[in-house]
């Protein structure tokens, strides 16, 4: 904007108002095309604010520094499941941590809604899934792959402590015969 404000009077004085509009009409689209690759790179390296805000609602992820949460949001994958569909099954290997974006998920009789995360036990304890998670309604989830999730959570002491608290509570509820918290 500043450069345009400086150049506009010079351009108008040199070639006139009409010709200036034609030049600007030709030059600006050409500049946009030339900078397109850099703009695409910027889009790929900037996390969506919605995904970042959703991840921040999960206590163990909220403890992470903002750049780490933004990186996780950039690497996250959006996944959908229809009502009644299993998302993860008890006994299978864990490969992702999930955060509910919309809809409802049921795990051992307990429901999880938007902003709730699940699947951390298998990833952080390196054990098979401890329960089946099923979509009660159509759900939109944000999925974090094992590697980035584990590295982020275990690499930051406050997040690791928050994760240990969640895991201990869920395993305690599971061993007591209750739904995980």
Question: Model-flagged regions — what are they?
Answer:
Residues 26-48:
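Multi-pass alpha-helical transporter architecture, strongest
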Residues 53-131, 147:
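Regulatory nucleotide-sensing modules
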Residues 2, 16, 37, 103, ...:
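C-terminal structured domain segments across diverse proteins
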Residues 24, 122, 145, 153-156:
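Short, flexible helix/strand-to-coil boundary loops that buttress conserved ligand/catalytic motifs
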Residues 2-24:
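Transmembrane alpha-helix termini and helix-breaking/packing motifs in multi-pass membrane transporters
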Residues 35, 139-148:
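A short hydrophobic beta-strand segment most commonly corresponding to one strand
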Residues 51-54, 68-69, 128-130, 147-181:
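A small-molecule sensor/coupling module
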